[in-house]
């Protein structure tokens, strides 16, 4: 008899060496309860009103893995111009700017067009009121628990508000083990017990990204791959590492890929690294792509050479007079600072303190001359003061990676970093876990299988479209990105597709998608959608090349 192979969700890198009980249905109810609390919690943060845009949860995807949980927020952009609107009845939503952020497929994040049902669902005059169109689907809606028991104010603004939540929320069941059962529940209770948590500036800044320009050939690829995706689509990824027993005492990393090149932030430098490999890894990161206002390549090369010289001096003084210790990584608008842990490696020799002070001053001057912006230096000094380095320079080690590709530094960015640090420590302390908050810029939809799976589910929900047309739209531009690391894609849809009387399964494959090789890099994501004809399921598998280092965004990598 043939040996039954392990499911693909078990063979993912994130799920290996895990407890088999995670994949059982024993803890299914508790996992669903925690998912609902998470969605309720994030949707209740700064709800939109008639006067304020608020935090519009365009789409929230929760992916559970045995060792971590990904929470993907798809954030609609604020309109460029908010036109004056006359006083009218709240029922008339025509031309109103708050209707544009209606939850829908990825394309709805950038378009006000939608179905008649979506256009009829608008916000009322009150912050907590909603005017909804009544149709058959909403009349037959079954609540998870009675209305009186909704103590968390569950009013999910996401499309998955029906009885059957997407299986992508529970693909591997990280919380099915009793060991991790209460972690997400603690996060859900934060909104109820701590009013200061709601008032943080993190969500005001973080969840309302301004329009950013996307350069490079990938912008054209995005426009043609999925009609829904735009090059400036932003979403945040919040990862909770469930090290409840052995909590590591380091500040989690904040990765801002809008300004930092991919691969700059690597938490692998933390702890246990050998001296030679650590030096090699750090020296490999000494790469500068400084673009000043001038277009003269010779001047740029000279400035780059001088700056590298000072950085190498900082690297040589990094471990002077101390032993090599664990470091923490703090990216800052494209400038990456390395500081030793507080209280480790105190320099008693005044010579080293004076040398570091002189070197820090020279670095400030060089950065000011290269960037030509006083605002940059003010933010750098505030950031250094924030890290308590201004008074006591204990174990300071400094390397700078500057990625300024003619991009403006957003207003209030230093305040954003402060709020990120507060949120990080707050969640880490209250939940007894290591929290990593990231902001990821989508450059290619093929970075994540969950993006494609969710978009297909929306297309099946809104329109009775055939599987062939969906598949052809997705795979038509795959040959353009194959040199970047994508080998192939496999998509399967099951259900009464197109209103068929008998349910069937249709699959499409393009390129190489081997599911039987353990060392194959595969990103897998399922999705479930409720249609008029029943429940349909979607499975997407994307395979990446072994040689060209193509990886999925679910692993915090970038194609």
Swiss-Prot record:
Q: Name one GO biological process term.
A: translation
What is this protein identified as?
A: Small ribosomal subunit protein uS3m
Q: Which UniProt keywords apply?
A: Mitochondrion, Ribonucleoprotein, Ribosomal protein
- The principal location of this protein is mitochondrion
Q: Does the keyword Ribosomal protein apply?
A: yes
Q: Which InterPro entries match?
A: KH_sf_prok-type, Ribosomal_S3_C_sf, Ribosomal_uS3_C, Ribosomal_uS3_CS, Ribosomal_uS3m_plant
- Similarity-based family: Belongs to the universal ribosomal protein uS3 family.
A single GO cellular-component term from the record reads: mitochondrion
Q: Which organism is it from?
A: Zea mays (Maize)
| Annotated spans, Disordered | 113-134
């Amino acid at each position: 008899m043939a040996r039954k192979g392990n499911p693909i969700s078990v063979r993912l890198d994130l799920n290996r060496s895990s407890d088999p009980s995670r994949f059982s249905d024993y803890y299914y109810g508790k996992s669903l309860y925690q998912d609902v609390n998470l969605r309720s919690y994030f949707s209740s943060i700064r709800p939109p009103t008639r006067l304020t845009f608020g935090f519009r949860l365009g789409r929230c995807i929760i992916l559970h893995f045995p060792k971590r949980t990904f929470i993907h927020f798809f954030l609609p952009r604020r309109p460029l111009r908010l036109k004056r609107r006359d006083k009218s009845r709240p029922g008339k939503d025509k031309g109103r700017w708050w209707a544009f952020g209606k939850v829908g497929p990825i394309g709805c994040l950038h378009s006000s067009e939608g179905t008649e049902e979506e256009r009829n669902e608008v916000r009322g005059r009150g912050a907590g009121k909603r005017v909804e169109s009544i149709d058959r689907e909403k009349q037959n809606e079954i609540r998870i628990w009675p209305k009186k028991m909704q103590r968390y104010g569950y009013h999910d603004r996401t499309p998955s508000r029906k009885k059957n939540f997407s299986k992508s929320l529970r693909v591997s069941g990280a919380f099915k083990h009793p060991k991790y059962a209460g972690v997400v529940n603690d996060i859900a209770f934060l909104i109820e017990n701590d009013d200061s948590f709601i008032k943080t500036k993190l969500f005001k800044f973080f969840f309302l990204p301004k329009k950013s320009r996307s350069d490079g050939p990938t912008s054209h690829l995005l426009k043609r791959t999925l009609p829904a995706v735009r090059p400036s689509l932003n979403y945040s990824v919040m990862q909770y590492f469930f090290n409840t027993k052995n909590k590591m005492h380091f500040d989690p990393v904040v990765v801002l890929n809008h300004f930092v090149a991919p691969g700059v932030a690597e938490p692998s430098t933390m702890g246990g690294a050998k001296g030679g490999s650590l030096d090699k890894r750090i020296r490999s990161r000494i790469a500068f792509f400084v673009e000043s206002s001038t277009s003269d390549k010779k001047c740029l090369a000279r400035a780059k050479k001088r700056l590298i010289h000072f950085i190498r001096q900082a690297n040589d003084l990094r471990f002077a007079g101390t032993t090599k210790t664990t470091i923490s990584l703090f990216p800052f608008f494209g400038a990456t600072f390395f500081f030793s842990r507080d209280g480790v490696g105190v320099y008693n020799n005044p010579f080293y303190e004076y040398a570091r002070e002189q070197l820090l001053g020279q670095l400030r001057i060089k950065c000011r001359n290269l960037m030509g912006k006083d605002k940059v230096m003010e933010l750098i000094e505030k950031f250094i003061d924030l890290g308590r380095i201004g008074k006591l320079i204990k174990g300071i080690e400094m390397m700078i990676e500057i990625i300024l590709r003619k991009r403006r530094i957003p207003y209030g960015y230093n305040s954003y970093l402060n709020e990120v640090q507060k949120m990080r420590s707050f969640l880490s302390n209250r939940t007894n876990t290591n929290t990593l908050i990231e902001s990821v810029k989508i450059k290619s939809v093929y970075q994540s299988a969950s993006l494609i799976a969710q978009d297909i589910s929306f297309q099946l929900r809104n329109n009775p479209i055939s599987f062939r047309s969906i598949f052809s739209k997705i795979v038509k531009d795959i040959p353009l990105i194959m040199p970047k690391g994508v080998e192939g894609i496999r998509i399967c849809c099951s259900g009464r597709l197109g209103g068929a009387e008998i349910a069937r399964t249709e699959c499409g494959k393009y390129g190489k998608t081997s599911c039987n090789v353990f060392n194959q890099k595969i990103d897998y994501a399922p999705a479930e959608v409720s249609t008029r004809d029943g429940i349909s399921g979607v499975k997407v598998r994307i395979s990446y090349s072994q040689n060209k280092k193509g990886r999925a965004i679910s692993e915090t990598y970038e194609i």
